[in-house]
Amino acid sequence: MRKLLCSALLLAAAFAGRAQDPNFSQFFASPLTLNPALTGKFDGDFRVAGNYRNQWPTINNAFTTATVSFDIGLLKDRIPEFDQFGLGVMAFSDKSGNGVLQNNFAALSLSYHKALDENGFNQLGLGFQGTYSNKRLDITKVVFLDQLTANGFTGITNEIFSQNQLNVSYLDVNAGILYNGTTDGSNNFYLGASMYHINRPKESFQGGQYYLDPRLTIQAGGMLPRGEFDAIHFSAIHSRQANAVNTVIGGAYMLNLNADPENPTNLYMGSWFRLGDAIIPYVGLEFNSFHLGFTYDANMSSLKPASNMRGGAEISLVYIKRPVDPNRRKLNCPRF
C-alpha cells in the first residue's frame, strides 16, 4: 500500500469510509436515495427534490453531499385507478476531505405500485434502479509521508503517478419494496426495505480487489391527524452496510397556519435521533406545493470534541405539482 497520509480524516473518508454510503439526516426528503420503490409514489403530476448536506464543517469541510431528483407517474389512464407506475432520474454528488475524494452518481429508477383493495387504501410496490457511478481521487491535494520535514509537510514526494487524478467507474443495481396503507384515507403508514449495490461492483483505483458491500435499509413511518389542522409525522430507518450501522428515529408536529386544508401553509417542528451519534432538530415549512426542511446535527458521540458538537447542516426542498382537477380522488401515498 502506498505511503498515503492525507490526514486521519481523509484516511477515514477514502478507505475506512468505503464501508458506508453517504446518507441524509432528512432521509424522508430524499426518496430516490432511500428506496427505488418510492419512485413516482406521491399524489401529484411530478416531483422535484433537492438536498444539500455539509457534515463536520469545522473539520475543513469534511463531507459535502448534494442530490437532485425528478420523478413522475406514467400511464395513469391505462392502468387501474389506484395503481401507480413511476419513472425517476437522480444526480448525486459527494465530496470528502475538502474535495480530495469525489463520488458522482447518475441513476434511473422505475417502480410499480399495485392497489390491494378497491379503495386503494393498501398498496404494495416494487422499484428498481440502475446507477452509473464515478469516483475520483485528486492527487494534487494529497500529502504523502515522505514530504514530512522539520518544518512540516514541505518536502517533495517521490511518489509517481501517471496522472493527477485517479478515476474508477462502474454500474450499480438497486431495488426496493414498499407497503403503504391507511385505515380511513386521512392517516397514513408505510413500511419498506431497499437493497443497494446488489451486484457488488468493483471499486478500486489501482487494480485491487475491493468490491462494494450491499447496503440494506429498512424504513417505516406514518402520519396521524390530531385535529382538522394539525398532525403528528414520524419515521425511522435502520441500515447496515458491512460493519457500518445507521439508525435514525424521530418525528415532527405539523400545524396548519392558514386553516386551509386545500392550499395549506404548514409548519413542522420536531427532532430525529441518530442512535449513538447525534440529536437532529428539524424545522419545516410547506407552502404552494413546496416543502422546505432544515436540520442541524448536534454530535453527542466521541467526535464531539473535534466537531465542537457541530455535526453539520442540511437543507431539503421538495416540489410536487398538484393536479388541477379539484374533484379527483386523492392517491394514498407516504406523507413525509
Set out the residue ranges of the language-model regions.
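Sec-dependent N-terminal signal peptides
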Residues: 4-13
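Sec/Tat signal peptide C-region and signal peptidase I cleavage site
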Residues: 15-19
